[in-house]
Amino acid sequence: MTTEDHSYKDKKVISIGIVSELTGLSVRQIRYYEERKLIYPQRSSRGTRKYSFADVERLMDIANKREDGVQTAEILKDMRKKEQMLKNDPQVRKKMLEGQLNAHFRYKNR
């Protein structure tokens, strides 16, 4: 396993109510995105949905695209395309991670 596999961003520990507060999305919208296969929460033994920080980021990205008028089918298509590129090309993965880090530090240092 890589270090990334153990990242706090990937641990599914956040309830749907908290995700709703963090993203500004309604619980219904979050469930809709799950139905459309845009997000994959983990289910506890009691059936409670649990999300990760990476899921929260993904939901915010989805919400921004929806505000721009992008349909959910197109968002899903783009997400799958991006995931495939990451799997197939380590250089693309490295560049994307570098871009995310640069964006994070630029935002943090404002």
Swiss-Prot record:
Induction (record text): Under conditions of nitrogen excess, repressed by GlnR. Under conditions of nitrogen-limited growth, it positively regulates its own expression.
Effect of residue 98 to G: Causes constitutive expression of TnrA. Feedback-inhibited GlnA has a greatly reduced ability to block the DNA binding
UniProt-listed GO biological process terms: cellular response to nitrogen levels; negative regulation of DNA-templated transcription; nitrogen catabolite activation of transcription
HTH merR-type domain ranges (all copies): 13-81
Keywords tagged on the record: Activator, Cell membrane, DNA-binding, Membrane, Repressor, Transcription, Transcription regulation
Binding region for DNA: 16-35
Gene Ontology MF: a single term: DNA-binding transcription factor activity
Keyword Iron-sulfur: no
Subunit structure, interactors included: Homodimer. Under conditions of nitrogen excess, TnrA forms a stable complex with feedback-inhibited GlnA. Interacts with GlnK-AmtB complex.
Activity regulation behaviour: Under conditions of nitrogen excess, the DNA-binding activity is inhibited by the formation of a stable complex with feedback-inhibited GlnA. The presence of glutamine and AMP increases the inhibitory activity of glutamine synthetase by more than 1000-fold.
SMART domains, per the entry: HTH_MERR
Major site of localization recorded for this protein: membrane
Effect on the protein upon substituting residue 99 to E: Causes constitutive expression of TnrA. Feedback-inhibited GlnA has a greatly reduced ability to block the DNA-binding
Origin: domain of life: Bacteria
Remarks, miscellaneous: The amino acid sequences of the N-terminal DNA binding domains of TnrA and GlnR are highly similar, and both proteins bind to DNA sequences with a common consensus sequence. In contrast, the C-terminal signal transduction domains of TnrA and GlnR have no homology.
Organism: Bacillus subtilis (strain 168)
Functional description taken from the UniProt entry: Transcription regulator that actives the transcription of genes required for nitrogen assimilation such as nrgAB (ammonium transport), nasABCDEF (nitrate/nitrite assimilation), ureABC (urea degradation) and gabP (GABA transport), during nitrogen limitation. Also represses glnRA and gltAB in the absence of ammonium. On the contrary of the MerR members, which require longer DNA sites for high-affinity binding, TnrA requires a DNA sequence of 17 nucleotides as minimal binding site.
Protein name as annotated: HTH-type transcriptional regulator TnrA
Disruption of the gene: reported phenotype: TnrA mutant is impaired in its ability to utilize allantoin, gamma-aminobutyrate, isoleucine, nitrate, urea and valine as nitrogen sources. During nitrogen-limited growth, transcription of the nrgAB, nasB, gabP, and ure genes is significantly reduced in the tnrA mutant. In contrast, the level of glnRA expression is 4-fold higher in the tnrA mutant than in wild-type cells during nitrogen restriction.
